[in-house]
Amino acid sequence: MENFSLYLPTFYEFGRGSVDKVGSLTTAMGCSRVLIVYGRAHAKTSGLIDRVESALRHSAIEYDELGGVQPNPVDTLVRQGIALARDRHIEGIIAVGGGSVIDTAKAIAAGVPYKGDFWDFYGGGKTITEALPVGVVLTIAAAGSEGSGNSVITNVATRQKLGARTASILRPRFSIIDPALTVSLPPYHTACGITDMMAHILERYFSPTADVEVTDRLAEGLLMAIIDEAPKGMASPDNYQARANITWASTMAHNGILGCGRVEDWTSHAMEHEISALYDVAHGAGLAVVFPAWLTFMVDHKPAKVAQLGRRIFAIDIADDRLAAIETVARLKAFFKVVLGMPSTFAELGIAEPDIDAMVRGLHKVKGEMVGGYYKLNSSDTRSIYRMML
C-alpha cells in the first residue's frame, strides 16, 4: 500500500423526504442566492424542481434556473451558466439530477470566479484553485459525482470529452440522496447507471499496487452487493430497499475511498470517452462494451487480478489464472447483457462503422504514448482492444 491523503467534506442527507432539507443545507453552505441546474424535462415535469424551490423559498433563498443539461454534457451550456451566474450574482450552484447535471454544475462553479476560459481546466492543464460551492439533489444512481471532486464535459467544437479532477474543491458541500427519486427512471437508464458504478469500482480495483487487501475487499464487497441488488431493482423499480442499496453503492464507488493507497487504472473510461465524444452514446452503455474488451486483453497479458476478481465475486473454482480470467470475463459480460440488457458491441451501440483510428488518435493525444495504471498500453494495444468491440 502507498501513502495517501483523504479528505471527504461532503455532507450526505440520505433517505425518504430528504429533498425538503435543501433549504437548510443551502443556508448552511452560506448561500442566499443560487443557480438551480437541471436536465431537459423530467426534473420539471415530475414536480421535483417545484419541491426544491419551495424549500429554498422557505429558507429565504433566492434562485435562478438553468435547464437543458443533456447526457454527455457540453461546454456550450456551461458557458451559458457561467454568464448567467455572474450576471445574477449567484453565490452557489444546486444541481438537481444525475452525473451530467452535477458535472455541469461543477464546471459552472469553477468557471464563475476564473478570469479565463473554463475549458482551461479540462483541456488546457490549468488547476482549479477556487469555485462556488455546489449542493446536489441526486436523481440517478450512476456517476458518483455527488461525492467526487471530478467533472467531465464534452467540447462541441473539438469533439473532446475531458475531465477536471480536484481533491476537494469541486466536491459538493452537501448531497441529498433520496432513493425514491430514482424509482421513475426507465430500466435502460437504471442499467446504464449500474454499469457505470461497477466500472468506477473496477478502475480502482485493477491496480499494480501490492498489499491493498482492505480496498480490494471493499471493492469486491460493493461489486457483490450490486450484483445481488441489481436484479431486484431492475425487476421491481419501486423496490425502495434495492434502490437504496444501489444508490449508496454508486456514491461509495466514486467518493475516493476505494482508491486509497493504490495506483488506479482508468483506461476503460478514457477509451469510452473517445466513443461517446464521437457518437454521443450513453456512458454506461459504452462502458459495458469497453470494459469486457479491456479485460479480454488482460487475459493474455496480466490475468492474475482478473482471476482473483472472478474467484472472489463469482466463486469461480479454477486454479489456472488464465482460465479463471476467461471465465470471469464471460460472467461479467453475461451480467451486463442478460441481467442489465446492456450492449456488447459497437453495432449494438448503434455504431455501424466506428472510426477506430480517430478514437486511438484522440485517446493518445490526451493520455500520451502509454495509457493505463494496471498495464501500460500503446496505440497498437488500444487499437486491438477497440477492435475486440466490433
Question: At which residue positions do the language-model features occur?
Answer:
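Short glycine/serine/threonine-rich phosphate/pyrophosphate-binding segments
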Residues: 19-22, 45-48, 75-77, 100-106, ...
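Active-site segments that bind and position negatively charged phosphate/pyrophosphate groups
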Residues: 204, 208-331
